[in-house]
Amino acid sequence: MVTILRPDEVKAKYGPMFCQGLYTIVDEKTGRVRIIEKCSAHGPAEWDVVNRRRTGGVIDKVMSEGTTIVMDVSLGEKELNFGPASAELGGQGICACRIEGNEVRTTWYGIAGASVGVGACLPGCKDVLRTEYPDDFKMGGGHTAHVDIITPKLVRVIIGIDDTDTKEKGATWATSLAMAKSCPYGIFMEHKIIQLNPKSPTKTTNCCSTAVSFAVRVEDISKLIEYCFDYIKRNSYSEDAVMTVFQGLSIPDELRDFGWSAKSIMYKVEDAEKVAADCGVQIISVTGTGGIIGAVAAIGCADLGLEAAGVPEDFE
């Protein structure tokens, strides 16, 4: 018989623990899932990354960004290289990931101290819907434990924004960040300032657009887009403001190449519109159309890391 506990019940049983966030972001077109875990300290994040990398299973890639763990995971089930931590074995891992309607089920294994992580720390996180424990569950000491953690199915939505300001007023980066932090739908994930071609004759001053990403439930996507549109419209000083929308974990190569080359090439609006149509980017005129190139390029640069903020010469 399986025991099912909600996060509040886990906390009542084991006490408060340390996981501050656990998000499962799904891209069903590509069969990819990204799991993002927010830890309270570097120590557990670093140990978990190293051990999950050894363990393998359905984890294809795992890295840490400060105290945040980011994992790219395949759907399905795979055998683990699991056991007491060694050069060949990892002490914690995920052997299965499945989509069940609007939920994601992941099966976690942990041994000794790592069993506390999968048995109490992760299940007690507020973002978890429920955790299923087997009858013989024991954690800590030298015990091996496994649980199924069920979380909401989330989708990554990237909003590109450009031309909300004028030479007299406003800043697109500030407007977009305020929008993201105030948005009641989804989870605000990232804010990126995108440096565009500084030689553009239509630039305000620095020639930057912005990309903001959210992890959001499917049923809230339209509400998120509507909120962002209304916010930009209310807070734009320009008659050229444009927003773009992209859903998914993988930026198409054509779109990424356009974003990068927009830092040095003078594109026409028609070029941006073609790339957007080819790559599934929705272009929305908020107060005008002048920001189309920058807003499309913002999506293309959203996953470029530090390169998003610079021009090609910065990285030669």
What residues fall within each predicted segment?
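Conserved mixed alpha/beta catalytic, RNA-binding, or beta-rich assembly cores of soluble enzyme
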Residues: M1-E316
